[in-house]
């Protein structure tokens, strides 16, 4: 199974990127949720504009689908400058990065998505560019090779990553502003869904928006994807308007339950409960039992289930929590009740 095959995958798809551009907010006052990040960035941007300086280099990290690319574009819009976008895997050689840097205008934003995937040789070129606005490049080969320095206009590097821990210390230390994006509340997601529906011209009531929001796993990208699929259902099997009942029927048909779990999530939890007595069980045993790759479970399925408190990682292996039993209407084993082996851990 590939992450992007799932309806509730947080990672984006090429076609969605095009569709999402139409509904992305362009200014900070249109940006919903993340109140601390929004307030801080408004302050930093206003200060930089007041001094007629480029904004400090900014690192944005957090789970996929929370709006890192959107925020990078908003920063450029608020600063009144252009944004040049690329990603870590695309910048294979120092020359690739040099070409982008030398085409920047003063105060422009260079956005690098998946910045944790930059190659070491490209990263070395980035250090003096970030710190001194200079580009060190080698001319010639062998004994005749020499280094020359090119001055760059002051610019803002905005880096986005889902894995901040994989950044090297020298790179991380060169960012003056570091922002973490958190999962969204159902209330904020409902506001996002309502806004998107308005832009797309979809009739929808507040309860319909909330029904979509509560199944979107705290992620705007998933919420907008579910909205498009519910729209299809409403147009074909309903009267076009998205109500709570229509959203509920559509999402049940799409196999997304009220917690945002799909078939793969439920299969993982039920396998642990039915075949391994709730655990502890090793990752390799789970992978063999459900026919998935180890890394798929670890990187795709587990994170949200752990974040929601349905699975625990213990020194002896994975264990489901009492929330998993309650979700399926099953009796809770004694070890998850008060005084049981996993009761204290389950409450943490």
Swiss-Prot record:
Q: Which reaction does it catalyse?
A: ATP + H2O = ADP + phosphate + H(+)
Which residue stretches belong to region Small ATPAse domain (RuvB-S)? 185-255
In this chain, the stretch annotated as Head domain (RuvB-H) covers 258-348
One example GO MF annotation: ATP hydrolysis activity
Chain sites annotated for binding DNA: 294, 313, 318
Question: Can you cite a GO biological process for this protein?
Answer: DNA repair
Q: Give the residue ranges for region: Large ATPase domain (RuvB-L).
A: 4-184
EC number per UniProt: 3.6.4.-
The chain's disulfide connectivity reads none
Where is this chain's protein located in or outside the cell?
A: Cytoplasm
Q: Which residues bind Mg(2+)?
A: 69
Q: Which InterPro entries does the protein's record reference?
A: AAA+_ATPase, AAA_lid_4, DNA_helicase_Holl-junc_RuvB, P-loop_NTPase, RuvB-like_N, RuvB_C, WH-like_DNA-bd_sf, WH_DNA-bd_sf
Q: Which GO terms describe its cellular component?
A: cytoplasm; Holliday junction resolvase complex
**Superkingdom of the organism of origin:** Bacteria
Which proteins does it associate with, and in what oligomeric form? Homohexamer. Forms an RuvA(8)-RuvB(12)-Holliday junction (HJ) complex. HJ DNA is sandwiched between 2 RuvA tetramers; dsDNA enters through RuvA and exits via RuvB. An RuvB hexamer assembles on each DNA strand where it exits the tetramer. Each RuvB hexamer is contacted by two RuvA subunits (via domain III) on 2 adjacent RuvB subunits; this complex drives branch migration. In the full resolvosome a probable DNA-RuvA(4)-RuvB(12)-RuvC(2) complex forms which resolves the HJ.
Q: What does this protein do?
A: The RuvA-RuvB-RuvC complex processes Holliday junction (HJ) DNA during genetic recombination and DNA repair, while the RuvA-RuvB complex plays an important role in the rescue of blocked DNA replication forks via replication fork reversal (RFR). RuvA specifically binds to HJ cruciform DNA, conferring on it an open structure. The RuvB hexamer acts as an ATP-dependent pump, pulling dsDNA into and through the RuvAB complex. RuvB forms 2 homohexamers on either side of HJ DNA bound by 1 or 2 RuvA tetramers; 4 subunits per hexamer contact DNA at a time.
| Family designation | Belongs to the RuvB family.
Q: What is this protein called?
A: Holliday junction branch migration complex subunit RuvB
Q: What is the lineage of its organism?
A: Bacteria, Pseudomonadati, Pseudomonadota, Gammaproteobacteria, Pseudomonadales
């Amino acid at each position: 199974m590939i992450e992007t095959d799932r309806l509730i995958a947080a990672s984006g798809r090429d076609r969605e990127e095009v569709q999402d551009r139409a509904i992305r907010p362009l200014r900070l006052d249109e940006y919903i949720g993340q109140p601390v990040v929004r307030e801080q960035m408004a302050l930093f941007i206003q200060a930089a504009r007041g001094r007629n300086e480029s904004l400090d280099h900014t690192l944005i990290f957090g789970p996929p689908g929370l709006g890192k690319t959107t925020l990078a574009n908003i920063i450029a819009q608020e600063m009144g400058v252009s944004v040049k976008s690329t990603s870590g895997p695309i910048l294979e050689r120092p020359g690739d990065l040099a070409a982008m840097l030398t085409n920047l205008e003063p105060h422009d934003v260079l956005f690098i998505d998946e910045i944790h995937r930059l190659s070491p040789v490209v990263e070395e070129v980035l250090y003096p560019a970030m710190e001194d606005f200079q580009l060190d490049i080698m001319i010639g080969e062998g004994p005749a090779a020499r280094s020359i320095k090119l001055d760059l206009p002051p610019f803002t590097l905005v880096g986005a990553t889902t894995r901040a821990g994989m950044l090297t210390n020298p790179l991380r230390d060169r960012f003056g502003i570091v922002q973490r994006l958190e999962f969204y509340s159902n209330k904020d997601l409902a506001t996002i869904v309502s806004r998107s529906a308005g832009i797309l011209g979809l009739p929808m009531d507040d309860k319909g928006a909330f029904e979509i929001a509560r199944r979107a796993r705290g992620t705007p990208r998933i919420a907008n994807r579910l909205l498009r699929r519910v729209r299809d259902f409403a147009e074909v099997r309903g009267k076009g308007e998205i109500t709570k009942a229509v959203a509920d029927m559509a999402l049940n048909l799409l196999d997304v339950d009220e917690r945002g779990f799909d078939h793969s999530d439920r299969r993982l939890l039920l396998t642990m409960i039915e075949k391994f007595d709730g655990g502890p069980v090793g990752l390799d045993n789970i992978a063999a039992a459900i026919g998935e790759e180890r890394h798929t479970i670890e990187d795709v399925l587990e994170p949200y289930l752990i974040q929601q408190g349905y699975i625990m990682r213990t020194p002896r292996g994975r264990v489901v929590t009492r929330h998993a039993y309650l979700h399926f209407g099953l009796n809770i084993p004694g070890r998850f009740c008060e005084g049981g082996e996993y009761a204290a851990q389950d409450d943490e």
